[in-house]
Amino acid sequence: MKKTIRLLLVCVLGALFITGCSKETVYVPVTANTIEVTESGELIGYMVEPFDKEYYDINELAAMVETEIAEYNKNNQNLVQEAGRVPIVVDKVIMAEDGSKKAVVALKFYNATVYENYMGRKLFYGTVEEAVAAGYEVDKKLAKVNGGDLLTGDLLQKNEGNKILILEGVVSVRLPQSVQFLSANAKLDNNGFVDCTIDEELKYIIYK
C-alpha cells in the first residue's frame, strides 16, 4: 500500500505565507519537496513532481489521494491518541500556482510518528532535551548559524528548551521561528528556509 501511496504523492506544495528566519512575512511558492512546521505546531508535508501530460486530471488525482488517505487512516487509527482526530488530513490537491505544470498534494500529519510511518523516513520534532532523551546525539553535530561554536557543554544546556527538527531526506524546511543551529549538511537559503538537499542523511535544525 505504501508504494501506491507514494505514487499518488506526485507532489506536494502550495504558495504559502511563510515567516522563515526574519520577522517579515513573505509570499514564497514552494518549488521542491518541503516540510513545514506551522506557528501552531502543525506538521505539513509537501512534495513536488511534474504533472504535465495532457491526459492527467488533477480532479482524478485528488479523488485517488483522498481514497488512499482514508484507507490509511482506517488502518492506522491506533497512531492517534485524541478522539475525533485522524492520522493524516489531505490539505489540498491542486496544480502548482506558479504555472510550472506540477501537481500539488499537501498532507497534514497528526505527529512525527505518523509522518515516519507513512513516509518511511525518520523525523523527530520536539525540544532539544527531548531529542537527547530519545537517543539522538545532538552534541557536536550542530554549529551556530553563520559560523560559531559547536553545540556542546554549557551551550547545549542553554538550548535544551528550544525546538529541534531532525529529519531524513532531500527537502526544504520551513519553520515558524528563527533558526539558531544547523548540522553541516543543512544550510539557510536566501528566503530564510533550510536547504536540506545536500544528502539523504539526518539533518538537525534548532530554532526558537
Regions found by a protein language model. Give the residues of each.
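Generic hydrophobic, helix-prone segments enriched in Leu/Val/Ile
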Residues: 1, 15, 62-67, 179-181, ...
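Bacterial N-terminal signal peptides that target proteins for export
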Residues: 1-8
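Short, surface-exposed loop and linker segments with low hydrophobicity and enrichment for Pro/Ser/Thr
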Residues: 6, 34-40, 196-199
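N-terminal Sec/ER secretory leader and immediately downstream segment
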Residues: 27-90
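Mature, soluble, non-transmembrane domains
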Residues: 87-208
